[in-house]
């Protein structure tokens, strides 16, 4: 693996931003030396260098909250790295999902973030099936009931659009999306599977490859 483009600082370190590949949420800011970066690329597991312990730090080594690394990005100056990960549990030692859980300025959440969080909640409900949970109730009712609900919600979306009612359309479309996410989770698919398919269909094409995106 060629790390010649990485500009480590005078202590042999480079800052690493850890980002949830599903939601885009920033999880952690840590540091890596050459060995940690090499191990991350080799194992596809987040590995850092602890400045306090002066040793490699493998995320989840003691907590079990590992991070599968799906992509490693280097910034334009070569002096910062991004790990895009699929986290298995919270990133923060406090038990919070992200180390950046204290807002100084609260902002709007984008669609990718919200979809990722809703899907994660659905998966957790399907795993634990808590009493009183709508997801658990629909799961027990069976796939046919979920699919019937999708049909009902799709009809509501059509009616809202037909009536040119943006507010109603917004709510009905959200209901439809929720039940689509529930269906994906029931069948073992993820929003990333949809994103991959959409990207394959619509990504910019080279003028030399003989094909064109939609």
UniProtKB/Swiss-Prot annotation:
Which Pfam families is this protein grouped with? PRA-CH, PRA-PH
EC number of this enzyme: 3.5.4.19, 3.6.1.31
Q: Main site of residence?
A: cytoplasm
Q: Which GO terms describe its molecular function?
A: ATP binding; phosphoribosyl-AMP cyclohydrolase activity; phosphoribosyl-ATP diphosphatase activity
In the record, biological process GO terms are: L-histidine biosynthetic process
Region feature Phosphoribosyl-AMP cyclohydrolase, mapped onto this chain: 1-114
Q: Where in the cell is it found?
A: Cytoplasm
GO CC terms, sorted = cytoplasm
Name the pathway it acts in.
Amino-acid biosynthesis; L-histidine biosynthesis; L-histidine from 5-phospho-alpha-D-ribose 1-diphosphate: step 2/9; Amino-acid biosynthesis; L-histidine biosynthesis; L-histidine from 5-phospho-alpha-D-ribose 1-diphosphate: step 3/9
**Could you tell me which HAMAP family the record lists for this protein?**
HisE, HisI, HisIE
UniProt-recorded name of the protein: Histidine biosynthesis bifunctional protein HisIE
Upper lineage is: Bacteria, Thermotogati, Deinococcota, Deinococci, Thermales
